[in-house]
Amino acid sequence: MPDLKTMMLNFGPQHPAAHGVLRLVLEMDGEVIERADPHIGLLHRGTEKLIEHKTYLQALPYFDRLDYVSPMSQEHAYSLCVEKLLQCEVPIRAKYLRVLFCELTRILNHLLNVSSQALDVGAMTPLLWLFEEREKILEFYERASGARFHAAYIRPGGIAADVPEDLIEDIAKFIEQFPKYIDDVDELLTENRIWKQRTVGISEISIKQALDWGFSGPMLRAAGLAWDLRKSQPYEIYDQLDFDIPIGQNGDCYDRYLVRMAEIRQSISLVKQCIEKMPEGQIKTEDRKISPPSRAEMKKSMEALIHHFKLYSEGYHVPEGEAYAVVEAPKGEFGVYIVSDGTNRPYRCRIRAPGFAHLQALDFMAKGHMLADVAAIIGSLDIVFGEIDR
């Protein structure tokens, strides 16, 4: 009897469930996947090299364009890294506003993931409901920074500008009525028979396997390990806030969905706490080598105007050394490593994207599953190619 040959199938990069520009070469035995080979690099823009040719402030907007569905988390990691090199202390109000917007960013990210994962397996309604809520959060982004996506709001030394007076009030109102929309999606999906058939038991992964592959964030927590940098290595003011770490049991697509839904609820609680505890005060460091003089000062003093111009054209010089900062981004641990040679530009910047580690395990996770399950698996990984290809 002749040997049966496996079939090669190209999934993407134009496929709607590829979540961007993923080209997946599948080796298939009938409908069953023998091997899945992700081809990356179609969105490579050389970000790390571009950063070497920019000042520390000019490099910041590149981070918005990595994981472009949760931009402020990336800015946060970069700002913390530069602040480590500068040994700069950030005012307490700026810390609260940073955490407030990072948690809104987490909600923004998980809303997109849950709705698009549901769409990938055929549930259209959550996308229509949740995009309306995302739009409201993007409006808060716009009112704070002037941009819906590429905010450049969290900067080394603090934040770009204080929030408008009524914005905190509007966020509080939104957070009050928002949980009912999450309850609606919960009701629609969590116990839905078809949803469970498509996600329960698909690409199960143990804690050991997750750690071996370098998983972090919801991917690791869904496997059952309560590892969250906001608790285990607290940064900013997370040690003063009260929240739980949701974990899964089986590490399958269904558990990843449950963990993200629970994280949305935890983020709602964190946003409420930030609003309640929000102090008054400065939003930028007083160190004039890093933050510019105020507009009022520039109108009165020629030196202040020159100082402002030099700070934005030439940039500040960062002491020689190296630093690594990592934050609990919505997709996992997002790290930035910077080497400074004492000039106004980074000598080297290395970005640790969580999605890269998750995508490399796709072959391991998809093996033995059906072709139809690939969409469910990719949806549960929560990958964005801006950060994977960099």
Curated annotation (Swiss-Prot):
Q: What's its membrane topology?
A: Peripheral membrane protein
Q: What is its EC number?
A: 7.1.1.-
Report any Pfam family annotated for this entry. Answer: Complex1_49kDa
Which controlled-vocabulary keywords does the entry list? Answer: Cell membrane, Membrane, NAD, Quinone, Translocase, Transport, Ubiquinone
Cross-referenced InterPro entries: NADH_Q_OxRdtase_suD (IPR001135), NADH_UbQ_OxRdtase_49kDa_CS (IPR014029), NDH1_su_D/H (IPR022885), NiFe-Hase_large (IPR029014)
Family, similarity comment: Belongs to the complex I 49 kDa subunit family.
Function, as annotated: NDH-1 shuttles electrons from NADH, via FMN and iron-sulfur (Fe-S) centers, to quinones in the respiratory chain. The immediate electron acceptor for the enzyme in this species is believed to be ubiquinone. Couples the redox reaction to proton translocation (for every two electrons transferred, four hydrogen ions are translocated across the cytoplasmic membrane), and thus conserves the redox energy in a proton gradient.
Per its record, how is this protein called by name? NADH-quinone oxidoreductase subunit D
- Give the species: Wolbachia pipientis wMel
Taxonomic path: Bacteria, Pseudomonadati, Pseudomonadota, Alphaproteobacteria, Rickettsiales
